[in-house]
Amino acid sequence: MESTIGIDAGGTLTKIAYLNEKMQLAFEKFYSNEQNKIIDWLKQNTGKKQICITGGKAKQLQQLLSNSYKIVELNEFEATLIGVRYILKEEKYDINNFILTNIGTGTSIHYVYNDQYIRAGGTGVGGGTIMGLSKLLTNLEHFEDVIPLTKVGSRKELDITVGDIYGGILSPIDNSLTASNFGKAATIESNYNSSDILATVQGLVGEVVTALSLQFAETKNIDHIIYIGSTLCNNIHLQNIISSYTKYQNKIPIFLQDGGNSGAIGALLHVANKKS
């Protein structure tokens, strides 16, 4: 397996999984439009001879690499599921029945039962939405710049909550729940800043993704929802939104360490398992 690389070429990011000199699982990450950087990295790692590639931009990258490497292509969700099962085992989870929500550029949701899986649905709301709205509203272009500001932002000046609508009157549902994302921006003079906008954008995305995941979990009578994707990496604000909403509906949220690399891990393991 030390001569093999797993690559997940996504719409926004390309993730690479491989074994380093200490035979430890290691990762690299590039923007998918930085193909020259990806190729340069591969050239520097001369011991790598075989690539298993997956993801939406797999074909595009494969065309650039096919003359230099032996390449195996793997279905995107099969790769992700192999990676998720590996991480679950590493983190001592014993779960075979779950909803898997992958928040990438958009969001894909699958129902997993033992070795079977069904695509439940998805939404165009995801990491691409966060970055697109962040650019439009605050002119920030990079995820690494958005996250620190999000941590200090507040949604109180922009979101309308159930409590805002009912005032002091007893409401039929929790007063803290969001009644309208960004609703205050259209109705009153709000004292908000860029950090508040960024926090509210993530609130919108987190609640949409979680609401869909919860609907599918309820339909299938599933308790565990596993949330993965690079959008969650170092993004405590988004994780907290998803976690609190999931728990409020009496479901169990799980965030896997290195979950954003599950596709690349799965691609790497797919070839390794075939060799063994």
Curated annotation (Swiss-Prot):
What's an example of a GO molecular-function annotation for this chain? ATP binding
What's a single GO CC term here?
cytosol
Task: Give the E.C. number(s).
Answer: 2.7.1.33
Keyword terms: ATP-binding, Coenzyme A biosynthesis, Cytoplasm, Kinase, Nucleotide-binding, Transferase
Quaternary data: Homodimer.
Which PANTHER family did the record assign? Answer: 4'-PHOSPHOPANTETHEINE PHOSPHATASE, PANTOTHENATE KINASE
Spell out the protein name for this chain: Type II pantothenate kinase
What organism is the protein native to?
Bacillus cereus (strain ATCC 10987 / NRS 248)
Higher taxonomy = Bacteria, Bacillati, Bacillota, Bacilli, Bacillales
